[in-house]
């Protein structure tokens, strides 16, 4: 915290304040509308947050980071610039972007879901039915989800049903989410166990001055949020958000879905012992599909199948941060995560007799200790060092019938515990006033099979002119597989787990970056990149690779002999909100390939080749005192179509259940027509003295773009 810094509203002369000894501030009687907040302190570059929305019913909570200036001139005038386009993590050199809470409330198609919001950024391919994040042609499950500096299980409702690594809607509501970092490649040394990207999310602190409550009702369900002080004297606060939905309007491939989630954070600052926080997120999902009781209407196998699934996910922890004067801090977190999936499917014959087709039970519990020590030795040199110990407990059993009416056979089964241990050291060095070097090293060790990896990371940034910036970053990365992969069993091996000795999937990222500040409100960023993947688990003598994995299970023996290569360029032109108008155009051109166990190179499943996004929004201040806000937001996405493998018709006809078989020698060689996805949001906010009302209509995929789910054999035709 920086004491006695100046904070003011830039557009209103005489409206401002000074932070107290703990860096806290409050500006009373701010008019309703958009405002720009500036913070300044001697020896630091000014920080600025533009177009912050102030409403009548909720106070705005801001954490304004200031970067120490390395300029050695006796006197210098620094023009305040927005840091919205940069990551909060100052050791990020390329491929990083901050997702602000303010954006979360504006972008069309976001549905208050951070995973869908980042699909507007360059390098990310969006989906309609799923919020899975595919970066540069990588599968969504290769991304790491983090909350409060801890890796957490997939935090999405109906996780891994539509796409492994994604879901339908995030359990983390924008009501409680704070400013967060999103990385698309070449990320700093403190991040590991990820090969495509990292979504580093934070929960914000609640209002420590007064209670505020929010109620939201829509077709998705009921959303209740509350925040306020636990102790005004000690500035302790709480915030929580609960959502509940039981609606038949939601459907996934003919199934009904119910969901609920809870998020919270308790914050306890102290005078001498640092700051303590207790936080958590959780969800419960139910999904089920019924079979068609009229046998005359049976056309596909799905018509005579019935399934029921129930999912649980929870993550929570206790964090403590202690500042040693103003140049060092220690943050330690003890956390736990839990995920459970219970599911089953049965098939009916024409006599309406049922036989089991699939049975799944899995429980995963992680107990985590992580600690980071950050030290600023000077205004030119900062070092960060940390470690994480993750004790993983697992119990899982998956059984599938090879053919209809046959007995279930075990596909994956295991019970026990293992550990993933990691450590890193990362430094940022201001070589000169224009050159910055970020370098570090990360390592991890898996006790399950004694596999390890040591990964250097380095980035160099050059401020060529006040408006132009060049950067280059390189890093090595690795990721362990989901636990079920290690415990796959086959007929030939009996009770022996065939994949227990699998090594990490590894990757190397190289990314260039050019940023140009066209004006205070407009930025251009161009980032070419190349990613090499190696030691990828593949099936021997086959085109299968985990780089294309989208199903929730693997049933074959794998070897670390696969490769991958992603090459492309990301371009973003963004005009930040000013006078009620903002827009962003982002584009990605890329080619994503992989080499299977047969030694042949193929397109990856997620190789769309291009993604172009266009966002625009406009706000009008209405009402007698211009206190109400009408907002219209639009997003259009044009992207390459879904890829799929051609059907092997002869093999399909010879299959006892007529299950569709694919020609794996031509994996993902087919592609559907390009997709045009349109989303919109229209909202009107009425600000009264102590309450505000917002009415909104949100449309997802109003253009009717169709996605590829798969193929089914029609038994009638």
Segments (PLM) and residue ranges:
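Gram-negative outer-membrane beta-barrel transporters
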Residues: 530-532, 553-640
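C-terminal beta-signal and adjacent terminal beta-strands/loops
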Residues: 583, 637-659, 672-679, 683-717
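Surface-exposed extracellular loop regions of Gram-negative outer-membrane beta-barrel proteins
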Residues: 151, 156, 292-295, 340, ...
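A beta-strand signature from Gram-negative outer-membrane beta-barrel systems
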Residues: 63-64, 168-212, 223-225
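Short acidic/polar hinge/loop motifs at secondary-structure boundaries
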Residues: 28, 152-182
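Short, acidic, small-residue-rich periplasmic hinge/interaction motif at the N-terminus
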Residues: 5-10, 40-45, 55-107, 115, ...
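Outer membrane beta-barrel strand-and-loop segments of large Gram-negative receptors
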Residues: 362, 366-370, 411-422, 499, ...
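Transmembrane beta-barrel wall of Gram-negative outer-membrane proteins
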Residues: 218-244, 254-287, 308-330, 334-336, ...
């Amino acid at each position: 915290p920086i004491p006695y810094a100046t904070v003011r509203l830039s557009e209103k002369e005489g409206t401002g304040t000074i932070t107290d000894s703990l860096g806290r501030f409050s500006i009373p009687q701010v008019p309703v509308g958009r405002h720009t907040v500036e913070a300044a302190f001697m020896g630091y570059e000014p920080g600025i947050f533009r177009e912050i929305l102030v409403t009548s019913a909720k106070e705005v909570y801001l954490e304004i980071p200031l970067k120490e200036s390395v300029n050695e001139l006796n006197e210098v005038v620094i023009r305040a610039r927005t840091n919205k386009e940069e990551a909060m993590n100052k050791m990020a050199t390329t491929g990083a972007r901050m997702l602000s809470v303010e954006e979360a409330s504006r972008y069309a198609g976001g549905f208050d879901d951070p995973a869908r919001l980042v699909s507007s950024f360059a390098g990310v391919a969006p989906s309609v039915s799923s919020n899975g994040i595919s970066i540069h042609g990588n599968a969504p499950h290769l991304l790491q989800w983090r909350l409060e500096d801890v890796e957490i299980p997939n935090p999405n409702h109906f996780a891994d049903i539509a796409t492994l690594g994604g879901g339908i809607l995030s359990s983390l509501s924008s009501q409680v989410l704070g400013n967060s970092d999103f990385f698309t490649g070449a990320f700093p040394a403190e991040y590991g166990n990820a090969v495509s990207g990292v979504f580093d999310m934070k929960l914000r602190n609640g209002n420590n001055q007064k209670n505020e409550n929010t109620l939201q009702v829509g077709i998705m369900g009921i959303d209740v949020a509350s925040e306020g002080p636990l102790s005004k004297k000690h500035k302790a606060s709480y915030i929580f958000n609960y959502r509940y939905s039981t609606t038949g309007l939601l459907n996934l491939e003919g199934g009904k879905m119910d969901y609920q989630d809870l998020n919270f954070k308790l914050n306890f600052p102290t005078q001498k012992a640092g700051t303590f926080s207790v936080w958590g997120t959780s969800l419960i999902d139910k999904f089920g599909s019924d079979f068609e009781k009229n046998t005359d209407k049976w056309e596909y196998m799905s018509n005579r199948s019935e399934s029921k699934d129930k999912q649980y996910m929870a993550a929570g922890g206790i964090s403590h941060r202690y500042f040693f004067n103003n140049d060092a801090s220690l943050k330690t977190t003890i956390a736990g995560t839990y995920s459970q999936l219970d599911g089953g499917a049965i098939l009916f014959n024409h006599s309406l007799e049922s036989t089991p087709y699939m049975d799944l039970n899995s429980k995963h519990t992680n107990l985590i200790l992580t600690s980071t020590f950050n030290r600023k030795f000077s205004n030119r040199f900062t070092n960060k060092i940390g470690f994480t110990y993750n004790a993983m407990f697992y119990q899982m059993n998956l059984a599938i019938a090879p053919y209809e009416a046959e007995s279930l056979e075990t596909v994956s089964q295991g019970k026990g515990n293992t550990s993933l241990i990691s450590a890193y050291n990362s430094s940022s060095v201001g070589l000169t006033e224009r050159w910055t070097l970020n370098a570090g090293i990360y390592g991890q060790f898996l006790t399950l099979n004694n596999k390890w990896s040591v990964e250097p990371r380095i980035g160099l940034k050059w401020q060529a002119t006040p408006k132009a910036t060049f950067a280059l970053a390189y890093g090595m990365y690795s990721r362990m597989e989901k636990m079920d992969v290690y415990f796959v069993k086959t007929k030939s091996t009996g009770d022996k787990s065939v994949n227990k000795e699998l090594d990490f999937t590894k990757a190397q990222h190289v990314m260039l970056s050019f940023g140009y500040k066209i004006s205070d409100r407009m930025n251009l960023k161009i980032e070419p990149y190349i990613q090499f993947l190696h030691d990828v688990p593949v099936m021997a003598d086959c085109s299968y690779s985990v780089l294309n994995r989208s199903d929730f299970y693997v049933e074959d023996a794998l070897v670390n002999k696969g490769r991958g290569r992603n090459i492309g360029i990301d371009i973003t032109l963004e005009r930040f909100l000013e006078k009620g108008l903002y827009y962003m155009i982002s584009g990605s051109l890329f080619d994503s390939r992989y080499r299977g166990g047969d030694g042949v190179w193929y397109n990856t499943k997620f190789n769309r080749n291009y993604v172009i996004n266009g966002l625009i929004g406009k706000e009008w201040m209405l009402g007698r005192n211009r206190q109400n806000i009408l907002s219209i937001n639009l997003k259009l996405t044009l992207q390459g179509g879904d890829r799929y493998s051609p059907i092997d018709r002869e093999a399909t006809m010879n299959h006892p259940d007529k299950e569709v078989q694919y020609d794996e020698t031509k994996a993902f060689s087919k592609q559907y027509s390009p997709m045009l996805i349109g989303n919109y949001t229209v909202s009107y906010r009425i600000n009264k003295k102590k309450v505000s009302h917002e009415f909104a209509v949100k449309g997802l995929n109003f253009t009717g773009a169709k996605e590829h789910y798969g193929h089914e054999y029609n038994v009638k035709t």
